[in-house]
Design a protein with these regions (language model features):
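Extended alpha-helical scaffold and adjacent linker segments that couple domains
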Residues: 1-196
Length: 196
């Protein structure tokens, strides 16, 4: 049995509260799905930015060095995906991916190494972003199930679900901006030098 409350009234029911339902759904989501959705949200956010500044192009979450072109046409920003976070040290996943992309394009050596800069996620902020994405996916799923008729909610619960879904999406947007905080760029004469 579950305890419910509304406007100072409390009662027991055999169905879980809306918040409990969302928390259960969020807890059941697979990590891989959450990471894919974070990369999608990152791409959507980056592509919505109109002003690219001094960057000729911005590439989001490439699957490998082969997806990053090697041309002289200006500075390219490579926004590393969620699989390559940075922890402020040389041995991070982000630094390994940056070195791989800087040294080669696919199987061929990269010629225009000095035209690339990288933006990477802060490893410490990533967990809070994952939690926010789980909540957003859970509330969106509740809304979808309500619209499809698979979930029968009261009108007050529908309004609450819409508010919670919007709030969760806003939290994801905020956390995306907070998480991608590292700028990594090549410098010096050596092939593998990079500065963060």
């Amino acid at each position: 049995k579950f305890m419910h409350g509304d406007l100072g009234r409390y009662w027991y029911s055999t169905s879980p509260s809306l918040n409990r339902m969302a928390a259960d759904r969020a807890g059941q989501l697979e990590e891989a799905l959450v990471l894919v959705e974070i990369d999608k949200a990152l791409g959507k956010y980056i592509n919505s930015i109109g002003d690219r500044g001094h960057f000729e192009t911005v590439q989001v979450a490439p699957d490998g060095s082969g997806e990053v072109p090697d041309d002289p046409g200006g500075v390219r920003a490579v926004v590393l995906g969620v699989d390559h976070p940075h922890n402020g040290r040389d041995g991070s996943d982000a630094m390994a991916e940056c070195k791989d992309i800087l040294l080669q394009r696919g199987n061929t050596p990269r010629v225009y190494r000095n035209t690339l800069v990288f933006i990477a996620a802060d490893n410490r902020q990533l967990e809070s972003l994952k939690d926010a994405m789980r909540a957003a996916l859970a509330w969106t799923g509740i809304m979808r199930d309500t619209d499809n008729g698979r979930l029968d909610l009261k009108s007050s619960d529908i309004a609450l679900s819409k508010d919670k879904a919007k709030e969760a999406q806003d939290t994801v947007s905020t956390r995306l901006k907070e998480t991608w905080a590292y700028l990594i760029y090549p410098y010096g004469q050596g092939k593998q030098k990079a500065r963060q």
